[in-house]
């Protein structure tokens, strides 16, 4: 298990992360989300031992990570700002990785290079942004690490490459019990990938939860009746965002699905649809309850709404 215990990291007079605590179970995919400047990258770098926390502890199975080569030999970190040796080719980078990570799997490396159609002898500096991301992921996954840390790694990848890389991560988690921590400013990017999510805003933890728990017992409902009614008809339920147009009402409800069906069916609807909420919709509700504005924390763009 990885633990952050009351971790604070500052840069001069700027508090990048403030008293952050979380527990990351072994063999899970853990997401950190937040807007630009929320502290995601700083938290991840502190987690990896790139930065030293001024306060608190970062522990891997009770072992501190900072300046600990025994821990760091089991982890691979891909920064949002990729770095490769000047003029190095994928083949040359693989030789370097093999020296650092003895379990580096050349067979897997060649297979993944071939899949992405990356020239093993060409300078990585001449690659496009997406190809550089692919190369970084090929090298990282070929190391077969115990811990994989990804900072905005899916940025710049096309949908096909993104889906394939996610499948590789899933397989390594399932087969080798690899622990993965990934940051993103997009909930939608992580919704189908992560087991748990941590939301950061201005360096502080807003919310941490298992995705399954977040989505459980939250639904959106569309219902219609052939008689006149108002919101009071649903007083037996805990509902949010109620809207009524003509005879049709839409709202969000927090309750068990079977209870919602039983209560609403007893009122003789002519239309009843009960659908699960998206992760974004659940976060909106949870954050509103905590007094936060979802759009401010995640910087949701108009074309993403």
Place the predicted regions along the sequence by residue:
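ABC-family P-loop ATPase nucleotide-binding domains
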Residues: 79-135
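ABC transporter nucleotide-binding domain
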Residues: 165-255
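Catalytic Walker B motif of ABC-type/P-loop ATPase nucleotide-binding domains
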Residues: 148-152
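The feature captures the beta-strand-to-loop junction immediately N-terminal to the Walker
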Residues: 30-35
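C-terminal coupling/interaction segments
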Residues: 247, 252-305
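Conserved ABC transporter NBD signature motif
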Residues: 56-71
């Amino acid at each position: 298990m990885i633990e952050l215990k009351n971790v604070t990291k500052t840069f001069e007079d700027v508090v990048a992360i403030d008293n952050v605590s979380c527990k990351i179970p072994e063999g899970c995919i853990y997401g950190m989300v937040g807007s630009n400047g929320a502290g995601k990258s700083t938290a991840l770098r502190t987690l990896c031992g790139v930065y030293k926390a001024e306060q608190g502890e970062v522990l891997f199975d009770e072992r501190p990570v900072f300046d600990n080569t025994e821990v760091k030999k089991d982890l691979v970190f891909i920064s949002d700002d990729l770095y490769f040796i000047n003029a190095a080719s994928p083949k040359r980078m693989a030789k370097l990785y093999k020296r650092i990570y003895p379990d580096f799997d050349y067979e897997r490396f060649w297979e993944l290079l071939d899949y992405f159609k990356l020239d093993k002898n060409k300078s990585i500096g001449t690659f496009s942004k997406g190809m550089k991301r692919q190369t970084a992921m090929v090298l990282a996954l070929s190391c077969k690490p115990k811990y994989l840390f990804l900072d905005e790694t899916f940025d710049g990848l096309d949908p096909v490459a993104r889906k394939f890389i996610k499948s590789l991560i899933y397989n390594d988690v399932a087969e080798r019990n690899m622990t993965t921590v990934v940051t993103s400013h997009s909930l939608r990017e992580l919704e189908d990938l992560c087991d748990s999510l941590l939301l950061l805003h201005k360096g502080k933890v807003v919310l941490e939860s298992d995705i399954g728990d977040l989505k459980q017992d939250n639904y959106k409902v569309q219902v219609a009746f052939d008689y006149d009614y108002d919101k009071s008809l649903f007083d037996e339920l805990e509902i949010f965002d109620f809207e009524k147009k003509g005879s049709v009402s839409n709202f969000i409800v927090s309750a068990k699905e079977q209870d919602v069906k039983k209560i609403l069916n007893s009122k003789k609807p002519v239309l009843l649809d009960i659908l699960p909420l998206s992760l974004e919709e659940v976060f909106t509700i949870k954050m509103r309850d905590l007094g936060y504005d979802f759009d401010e924390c995640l910087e949701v763009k108009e074309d993403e709404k």
